Amino acid sequence: MKMVSTYTVPAELSHLSAIRHFVTQVVNGYCTDEDFLYDLTLAVDEAVTNIIVHGYYLKPGEKLASGNGTITILIEPFADRMEVILRDHAPQFNPTLNPEPDFSQPIEKRKPGGMGIFLVRELTDRMEYKPLPAGGNELRLVKLFPHP
């Protein structure tokens, strides 16, 4: 039987270290490949940072009035992959529709933003978005286990 590990934290940057620790502890129980662990942990860190900074804050330091300000992380192992589901109550936003940054432009001429989502895409094998019926978001990150 698969075990789903769940962790709910306040949507605050000060909890990123605890989130990384949670992901590391759970994933290490199923896959000890260092690159796999690093990639998945960094992808979760980037996605959660985006949720906190862009979803729950109007501008730096100013939280949204609505929503309960939490993020729930569910990690579910499968035979060939690990899936991480991030649920929040921030305004709905589909990151899978976000265009990739324009790398043909010098960095000083690029439109700001989008690097975190790009990094999450690059570090995972699949990223899926679903708006939650009662409001909020669900982002599923899928990472295939390395071949032996």
Predicted segments, located by residue:
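Solvent-exposed, flexible loop/coil residues
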Residues: 13, 17, 46, 97, ...
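Hydrophobic residues in the alpha-helical elements that line and stabilize the ATP-binding pocket
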Residues: 47, 51
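Conserved beta-strand-loop-beta-strand hairpin that lines the nucleotide-binding pocket
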Residues: 1-6, 52-148
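Helix-loop-beta hinge of the Bergerat
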Residues: 2-34
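Conserved short strand/loop->alpha-helix "switch" segment adjacent to the catalytic nucleotide/phosphoryl-transfer site
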Residues: 23-45, 109-111
